[in-house]
Design a protein with these regions (language model features):
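Bacterial N-terminal signal peptides
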Residues: 7-18
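Short, flexible loop/turn segments with low-complexity composition
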Residues: 357-358, 452-464
Length: 525
């Protein structure tokens, strides 16, 4: 198997914390499974019974489907951001990316200003110091290490990025074929941790952050062959059905590989669910399955957009919950976002001391037992998203009730949608509801101003500084170091020179593009 005793791993890392066993735990356990780039329509379980197409007609996720039948599906769940790092950081801290000054992929200010507020592990330990916390898999929060966030156990002290989901430790050799995206070894690690805590009667929180289904895509060959034999779906193209040996390894636009990877993720999840049941702790354990942002291969219909966008396809995500008292086989349409987990877990763990006032999240614990009948009191009754993407379309959005407003931060153009009638965001209603549009825009901008949210042109200035400074200098040095050998006919040097010159060309084009966007944005503000 892939497993190894957790005590060995901790000794190797040198982060054992002198934990002690408590009495039989009445406190609930929490298992948060975070998929990477998994879209709202990528499961075989329907995410919204009122919306046609809110499931996949090809991908098969029977274990998640079974869990949903025993628990609750949240049809209106949102990621904090449409890309990974700000989403994960916001979930961890219970705050919006806008407040954390980590709205895109840069974390410089966030690391300086928001370490030490409170995190999910720290909140649980505030509720009860007996809680033990572990994180396995993709970390991708450069601003802090897992131990800084209050995690007692992790497989890599500094945390991990995307590369560990594709390569062995040398970052050159791909993972073995029987452990694509580390799905099964990470699951075994998580099972080992859960067993140790259950045997010690210690309440625990574990977050298993899978590398799947982020690129590069990979799957078990046997699962791919299963999908090869299934009826061809609408999304398929002829090249999807080429023989394995005619398709490049880890190809990320290959439907059979993507479908198989989703089912392999579900298989690993099913193994974890079986383990919880075998230990007899399922009646005292909350299990949450969700995603860090939107995704989807070849579109997210009926949703508009995908990862990197504040349309529904970029931020609406699957969310399934089961555990003690959670209504079985129910759907809940109460809007929620990833920053709600910290106060939710804190309430369920019995926490009573006030949490930091900076939190944006609110507890949705009552929805577990009451569904749509629950009252979730949220300041402003709205979810606000800010994605000042310096390298693309910068946007902010707000959802309040059925209405959602999207604002382009370069052009200042706004669009208003009524999601209950137009989930695909095709019909701009701002001329029909001008007062609603004005109210939402004002509420959104007042919030962003109040938290000092990042400005897109300030981020672009920083991006330009990197492009025209350190990045370009290093690329030109790499090109110069290979020029003489390349001229002498050295094939390896020729390849490295070509790659460096291609990168230099891209950097210069990005600089031109960024300056053009800055000028256009300044002209509209």
């Amino acid at each position: 198997g892939f497993g190894f005793p957790l005590s060995v791993a901790l000794a190797l890392l040198g982060i054992a914390f002198g934990l002690h066993a408590g009495s039989a735990a009445a406190e609930p356990n929490f298992i948060l499974i975070l998929a990477d780039d998994l879209g709202w329509t990528s499961l075989s379980k329907t995410m919204d019974m009122t919306k046609p197409g809110a499931r996949s007609d090809f991908y098969q996720t029977p274990h998640l489907q079974g869990m949903a039948d025993r628990g609750m599906v949240f049809s209106d769940a949102y990621a904090p951001a449409p890309v990974c790092t700000p989403s994960r950081n916001a979930m961890l801290h219970g705050m919006t990316p806008a407040r954390m000054l980590n709205s895109t992929l840069n974390t410089d200010r966030s690391s300086k200003e928001y370490r030490g507020k409170i995190t999910i592990p720290q909140a649980l330990k505030l509720a009860n110091p007996e809680y033990v916390a572990a994180h396995f898999g993709k970390w991708h929060i450069p601003a802090m290490k897992p131990s800084d966030a209050g995690y007692d156990f992790t497989e890599k002290e500094k945390g991990t990025g995307n590369g560990e989901g594709d390569y062995l430790d040398d970052m050159r050799t791909h993972l073995p074929g029987d452990d694509p995206k580390r799905l099964f070894s990470l699951t075994q690690m998580t099972k080992d941790f859960i067993s140790e805590q259950a045997n010690a009667e210690q309440p625990f929180f574990v977050q298993l952050s899978h590398y799947s289904v982020h690129i590069w895509h990979d799957s078990l060959k046997e699962t791919r062959e299963k999908y090869r034999a299934l009826p061809r779906p609408l999304k398929a193209v002829d090249s999807d059905y080429l023989p394995d040996d005619e398709i490049p390894d880890f190809k990320h636009n290959w439907l059979l590989n993507y479908a198989a990877m989703i089912e392999d993720t579900d298989r690993a999840f099913g193994d974890l669910l079986d383990h919880i049941e075998a230990l007899g702790i399922d009646d005292n354990t909350y299990v949450i399955f969700t995603s860090d942002n939107g995704g989807g291969l070849r579109g997210n219909a009926p949703l508009q957009g995908a990862k990197g966008d504040l349309t529904e396809g970029g931020i609406r995500i699957p969310l399934v919950v089961c555990g003690p008292g959670v209504l079985e086989g129910q759907y809940c349409s109460v809007p929620t976002a990833g920053w709600d987990w910290l106060p939710t877990f804190y309430q369920l763990a019995g926490g009573t001391a006030p949490l930091p006032k900076e939190l944006d999240g609110v507890s949705i614990a009552d929805t577990f037992t009451l569904g749509d009948k629950a009252t979730v009191e949220r300041p402003g009754d709205a979810l606000i998203f800010h994605f000042p993407w310096y390298n693309g379309e910068p946007e902010s959005s707000i959802r309040r009730g059925d209405f959602k407003l999207l604002k382009n931060l370069d052009t200042q153009a706004v669009a208003l949608y009524k999601l209950s009638e137009d989930l695909s965001e095709k019909h701009d209603l701002k001329s029909s509801y001008p007062e609603m549009a004005a109210s939402l825009e004002q509420q959104m901008m007042e919030y962003l101003d109040s938290v000092g949210a990042e400005d897109v042109n300030q981020l672009r200035a920083g991006f330009l500084k990197n492009i025209e400074g350190e990045w370009l200098t290093k690329a030109e040095a790499r090109a110069d170091s290979n020029r003489a050998a390349a001229a002498a006919g050295n094939a390896q040097a020729q390849q490295q020179l070509a790659e460096a010159e291609k990168y230099i060309k891209w950097l210069k084009q990005e600089a031109i593009f960024t300056r053009e966007r800055m000028a256009m944005s300044e002209g509209n503000n």
